Curated annotation (Swiss-Prot):
Lineage summary: Eukaryota, Metazoa, Chordata, Craniata, Vertebrata
Modified residues (N6-acetyllysine): K146
Protein name, as recorded: Kinesin-like protein KIF11
Species per Swiss-Prot/TrEMBL record: Homo sapiens (Human)
Localization: Cytoplasm; Cytoplasm, Cytoskeleton, Spindle pole
Subunit structure, as described in the record: Interacts with the thyroid hormone receptor in the presence of thyroid hormone. Component of a large chromatin remodeling complex, at least composed of MYSM1, PCAF, RBM10 and KIF11/TRIP5. Interacts (via C-terminus) with the kinase NEK6 in both interphase and mitosis. Interacts with RARRES1 and AGBL2. Interacts with TPX2.
InterPro entries for the chain: KIF11-like, KIF11-like_kin_motor_dom, Kinesin-assoc_MT-bd_dom, Kinesin_motor_CS, Kinesin_motor_dom, Kinesin_motor_dom_sf, P-loop_NTPase
Name of the gene this protein is made from: KIF11
Amino acid sequence: MASQPNSSAKKKEEKGKNIQVVVRCRPFNLAERKASAHSIVECDPVRKEVSVRTGGLADKSSRKTYTFDMVFGASTKQIDVYRSVVCPILDEVIMGYNCTIFAYGQTGTGKTFTMEGERSPNEEYTWEEDPLAGIIPRTLHQIFEKLTDNGTEFSVKVSLLEIYNEELFDLLNPSSDVSERLQMFDDPRNKRGVIIKGLEEITVHNKDEVYQILEKGAAKRTTAATLMNAYSSRSHSVFSVTIHMKETTIDGEELVKIGKLNLVDLAGSENIGRSGAVDKRAREAGNINQSLLTLGRVITALVERTPHVPYRESKLTRILQDSLGGRTRTSIIATISPASLNLEETLSTLEYAHRAKNILNKPEVNQKLTKKALIKEYTEEIERLKRDLAAAREKNGVYISEENFRVMSGKLTVQEEQIVELIEKIGAVEEELNRVTELFMDNKNELDQCKSDLQNKTQELETTQKHLQETKLQLVKEEYITSALESTEEKLHDAASKLLNTVEETTKDVSGLHSKLDRKKAVDQHNAEAQDIFGKNLNSLFNNMEELIKDGSSKQKAMLEVHKTLFGNLLSSSVSALDTITTVALGSLTSIPENVSTHVSQIFNMILKEQSLAAESKTVLQELINVLKTDLLSSLEMILSPTVVSILKINSQLKHIFKTSLTVADKIEDQKKELDGFLSILCNNLHELQENTICSLVESQKQCGNLTEDLKTIKQTHSQELCKLMNLWTERFCALEEKCENIQKPLSSVQENIQQKSKDIVNKMTFHSQKFCADSDGFSQELRNFNQEGTKLVEESVKHSDKLNGNLEKISQETEQRCESLNTRTVYFSEQWVSSLNEREQELHNLLEVVSQCCEASSSDITEKSDGRKAAHEKQHNIFLDQMTIDEDKLIAQNLELNETIKIGLTKLNCFLEQDLKLDIPTGTTPQRKSYLYPSTLVRTEPREHLLDQLKRKQPELLMMLNCSENNKEETIPDVDVEEAVLGQYTEEPLSQEPSVDAGVDCSSIGGVPFFQHKKSHGKDKENRGINTLERSKVEETTEHLVTKSRLPLRAQINL
C-alpha cells in the first residue's frame, strides 16, 4: 500500500501538466454603452468561474458556467494579473524551463493591453512604475531585478517577430526594409522546435534598452482602425526573451543554464461584417481568422489525442508547436467582452479556452551546458560559417538561378513537411500496433494463470472438508483441557497476587534502607569535600595576605624615605631662591631714589626756564600794550579830522574788529575745551596707571607715546593763531614732553611704589586744570563782554555821530583805562602762572620725599616677607616630618590590626571545622524488622493423560455434546459456505461487474490506455475489446493477491 502514492505521482509526472488557462473580462467601452448593451458575463475570482447568460435580460435561468485556473473581473488591475499569472512562470524561466504566455480572444477585448499595456497620460510615471504597464515591460523589469539581486552572471537576448498575412517579419531589423520576409526551418536539435533564419537577437544590458526596443518594435508593428477597435492589431507578435545564466558546481565546473520566455500577442478574431473591414483589411482579417482557426483545430486535436495534429497548416501553430503539447510551460490568457453584442464571440473564446485546459505538456528543464561544450558548439558553428564563406569566395559550389532555387527550396520544404507527417503517422500506427499486441499477450497469460489457480483452489477445498471433521473432535478435547487450565490459572493468579503484595512491602522497606544509606553517604561526602576545599582556600588566602602585607610595608618605607629627601631638597632650593630675590630687590630699591633725584633736578631746571620765559612774556605783553595804546591815540587823532563819512568807515572797521575778536574768543574757548579734553585724558591715563600697576612696561610706553602725539596735535592746531601766546604754550608743551620722556624711563622700576601717590597727583592735576579752566573762562567772558560793549559803542557812534567830538575825550580815557586794565590782568595772569609753577616745584619736592619713603618702606617689607617666607618653609618642613612620623605609627597599627584579623580568621576556621559541618540526624523513616506472610506452594495442572482419562469417564456428557454439535451442523456448514462465497466473490465479481473499474484511473504506464479509453466513448468495438481484456487481467491480478492473503489464516487454523 505504501508504494501506491509513489507510483501514482510518478505516473502523474509521466502524464504531464495541463496548460494553465486564465480568463480576463474587460469593462464596458464607450461604443458598447452607446449601443445600450447589457452585461452577460459574471466573473467569480474566488470560485474561479465565469458565467454567461445566453437567454437575454428576461431569461436569467439559461446560462453557461465555465471553470478555469484563474478568473479576473473588470475591476482587476494590471499588477494583479502580472503577480498571479507571470511571477510563478518567471521563477521557472530562471530555473531553466521554456515558458510561453499568449493572449487569445476577440478583437478589442484587451489582448495587447494585457501583454504590452499603455503609458499613463502625460507620461508621469516610468515604465516600471506605470500602473497601466502590461506583462512584457513588467516581466523584463523583474528579470533584471531578480538576476541582479541573485548576483549571478547572466546575459539577456530579445527578439520580436511579426506574423502578418502568414509571412514572418523581424520588427527589430536594423535595416530600413521592413518588408523583408524571414524563412522558417525545423530545429534538428529539437524535433518540435523551429529556427527562423535571419531573425535578429539583440543583447540587452538593462531595462532602459528593453523599453527602447519595445517602442521600436511597436512602431513597426502593423495596426489599423476598425469599427471594433481604433488600434486593432493586424498581425501576431512573438516577443522572445532568452536568458543565459552561469552556475558553478561544487567541483568548480562552470555550467550555462538557459531559460526562454515567449510572450505572444495574438491578433483578435473578428466578424468582417461587424468590424467594417474591406479590401486589404478584409484580407488581413481572413488570414487572422485562418491562423486562429488552425490554432483551434490544433487545440481540439491535442484534447482528443488524435494521431495527427495539424501544426503545419499555419505558421503561428508551427511556431507554438512546442508550447502546445511539448516540453514548454504554457499559460493562455483568454480575454472576453462583457457586452451582449459580443455574445457569440465570447462563447467561442470560452469554449476554446475551456478545451485548451485539457492539453498536457511535459515541461523539462533545458540541458545545462558546460563551458567546454558551449565553446565547442560555437567553434563548430564558426568553422561551418568559414567553410560557407570560403565556398562563396572561391565559387566552388553549385550555382543556379534564383527562380529555380526558390522552386527547388519550396519543393524541398513541402517534401520535408510531407515526410515528417508520414513519419509521424507511421510512428503512431506502429505504436498502436505494439500496444495492441502487448495487451493481447498480457490478457492470454492472465487467462492461463486464472485456470491453473481455479484447479488448485478446488483441490484445496476438498482437503479442507476432510480436515474439518477431525478438527471438530480435536476441538472438544482441547475445550475440556482448556477448562482445566482455566481453573488452575485462577488459583495461580490468587497466589501470585499475594506474592506481589509481599514483594511490594519488601521493596518499600529495602528502598527506605537504601535511602538512609544514601543520605548518610551524601552527608559524609559533603563534609569531607567542604572541609578539604575550605582548608585549601583559607591557607592560600592567608599566605597571599602575608605576602601582600610584607610587600606593602616595604613599599611604604621606601616611599617615606623618598618623601624625606624630596622635601629637604625643596626647602633648600626655596631658601636659596628667597636669598637671591632679597638681594635683587634691595639693589633695585637703592637705585630708585638716585633715578628719581636726577629726574627731579631736571624738572627743577625746566621750571626755572619756564619762570624766565614767563617774565619775558610779561615784558613783551607790556610792550605790546604800550604800542597798542600809542597807536590807538594816534589813530584817534587822525580820525577827528575826517567827516561823518570817514566815521561810518571806521564804524564798519570796528565791526570787523569785533567779529575777529569774537572769533578769537571762540578759538580761545575751543582751546580751553581741547585743554580740558587733554587734562581729562591725562587724568584717565593716570587712573589706568593706578588700576593697571601689574601691566608691563610696553603699555606704559604706549600711553606716553599717545600723550606725546596728543600734545603734538594740539601744538599743530594752535600754531597758526595767536602766535605770541602759542609760542609760550609750545615751549611749555615741549617742556612737558621732555618731562614725560624723562619720567617714562624709570617708570618700569618705580611703578609698583607710586600707586598711592598717583591718586594725589591726579587730584592736584584736576585742581590745576579746573583752575586753568576757570581763568580761561574769565578771560573769554571778558572778551565777550568787550565784544558786547564794542557793539554797543558802534551803535552809539552810528546813532550819535553828531556828538562824536564831545565824546572823543571820553573815549580816549576809556581806552586808556581798558589798556591799563588789560595790562593789570596780564600781569596778574603771569603772576598766577609763576605761583602755579612754584607750587608744582614744591609738589615735586614732596613727591621726591614720598618716593624715597616708599622705597625705604618697600625694602623693609621685602626683607620682612623673605624672613617670613623662610620661617614658613621651615615650619612646613617640620609639619611634613611630623606627618611622616604619624604615618609610620599608623602603618605599625595597621600591621597589628592585620595580625589580629588573621587570628580571628583562624578562630573562625576552627569553629567551622568543629561546629559548622553537617551531622547525620535520624529521620525516623528507617523500616523496622518484621516477618512476611506469603504462600509457599503453587498449584499445578494434572497431566494430559489423566485429563483424557477423566474425559473418557465422562463419555455420556461427550455424547450429549456431539448430539448438540450435530444439531448445530446447519449453522457450521453455512459458515463454510460463507467462506467459499467470499472466495468466489473475489474471483467472479470482476468478470461480471465491469463498471467497478474507475474510468478516470491513470493508465498511461500500461501502453497507451488513455488513447483507447478515449476511443471507447466513440463506440469502436476493437478498442472496447482491448480495454475489457485489460480490465479482466488487472482484476484477476488483484484477486490472486487477495486470495493468498485470505488463505493464510485458514492454514494456520488447520495446523492448530
